[in-house]
Amino acid sequence: MTQDKLRNIAIIAHVDHGKTTLVDQMLKQGGVYRENQVVADRVMDSGDLERERGITILAKNTAVHYKDYKINIVDTPGHADFSGEVERILKMVDGVLLLVDAAEGPMPQTRFVLQKALDLGHKVIVVVNKIDRPDARVHEVIDEVLELLLDLNATEEQFESPTLFCSARRGIASYSPDEEGTDLTPLFETIVNYIDPPKGDREGPLQLLVSSIDYNEFVGRIGIGRIERGTVRQNQEVIVCDYHDPSIKEKQKIVTLYEFTGLGRSPIQEASAGEIVAFSGISDITIGRTLCVADAIEPLPFVKISDPTIEMTFSINDSPFAGREGKYVTSRNLRDRLQRELLKDVSLHVKEVGTDSFNVAGRGEMHLSILIETMRREGYEFQVSTPHVLNKEIDGKLCEPIERMVADVPENSVGSVIDKMAQRKGELISMTPIGSRMRLEFLVPTRGLFGYRNEFLTDTRGEGIMASTLETYQPVKGEIERRLTGSLVAFETGEACAYGLGNVQDRGTLFIAPGTEVYAGMIVGQCNRNEDMSVNVCKKKQLTNMRAAGSDEAIRLAPPKVLSLEQCMEYLADDELLEVTPKSLRMRKRILDHSARMRAASKAKN
């Protein structure tokens, strides 16, 4: 295919603004499916977790044909925790679709990714999605997008980018908000006419920058990247080199070459500059390496991936229930699995501490919780500590990561949200009314947001939307209270029964139901006071002839509060761990024995 018939674009949007749905419709209307083929919704979110949570975690590639053009589309994650993915992906494309919700307008992640795209000089097509929402405010949202482009120092050409109005769910787009579209033709036409075809000398020596990695059990690692110059062929011998490490010059061979077609990849014999391709055969290929030929070794510079901001310790499970539910339980299993994750995920850092513990650093709570949930589903059993922020030294001062947090809340909850943010060292920078709601923007330390999402949902009665993205580093802002309450800790090992739980439920909120197996040192609830309390939930009622069988009142138990993985991570204090197995999530104290725990606490006080 000639270069002028190629277009490479990425889709930028905030979580849940509909980018994966839009790609679905582009695939349908680009003739990727047969007429009678039944297709799942959001077909690009192929991982189980992605489909359940409705978010995109890994950037995916696909291609659609329109007339005689081939449009390579890259679907990027909208969540800031996966922004390591976004930065690399933008290097592969020549333009971006900026997708914005017609009611919510541009959100923090949109800002983060758009900044990266503008810095690379990409052309932008603005797409206002969900125009059929009852609370859509199309004209205001367009003004907000223009303000955002001004804020981010867009060039004149980027500022005058074309705007389209669409409903991705119905698969329609139009040039004006007052017209009703019939299909996505306006979108395809704008992409073809406005985005430049890829540049690159097809006759020169090969240069291919690897921007993404896939893994397949049959062929091993698959490199994905864009050919910047020259032509690559199947079975060709290449030199793998690295811009940051001149000593790396390995001779390798490309075994299979693939192009992206619709939802899959098809093997091809050769591809030239401007194409996005995948290849297998180089077992240790990593992101950021360049493929060249022997007589022209010129590695390409690579986008520096932002540093991780939070860290957790992963270690083998040493609780009394260890090894009961998991398939992979040893430190060797854990090490191998984390090393395998590093092959795919560039923004993850793993460091071994001691014999069976690993410090795992990532871009945010979501980033690490997805890793934990994925490992758990694969049959791993391990335990993790509470997340800690990674500080940096800048000009001799210790600085911590600061996030820009945007919250859309009902008017009657504004006071409590501002109050809670102030307690967490948050600084209110703007407050704008949007319909019957308020949009609040804060600059808040990353550690101030740990454990806040639950409180936020309670304060806004489940109606608030919050999102945050890393903004800058500032000197450490002093102490922030993580949790104001203590835990209810099981005193002995056994099975929780209704009588024992009935005696305890007035002391706080229970996390377990009767019949749950517990061990000494396991957390069974949240205490009303700001200190831990040891409780006996296994206590059975003494049955003697003194008590008539019918004279007792039935025990009334409130239903237990069941915590999700993220809620457990947010709940943990420094002296607590989360035990993760394929079947259970159990929170526990680091020191299980009650007396040893008391001694350690008094020692720490003194």
Where on the chain are the PLM-derived regions?
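P-loop NTPase switch module centered on the Walker A-proximal segment
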Residues: M1-V100, E104, E144, I213-N216
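Interdomain boundary/hinge elements
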Residues: V38-D41, V126, L152-L164, P198-L209, ...
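Short glycine/threonine-rich beta-strand-turn micro-motifs
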Residues: S167, V353-H367
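Conserved nucleotide-binding/hydrolysis modules and their immediate coupling elements
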Residues: Q207-M312, A322-R324, T485, G494-T544, ...
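Helix N-cap motif at beta-to-alpha junctions
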Residues: T231, S283-D284, G362-L368, E411-V414, ...
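A short, contiguous, amphipathic alpha-helix enriched in charged residues
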Residues: S319-L342, A554, A558
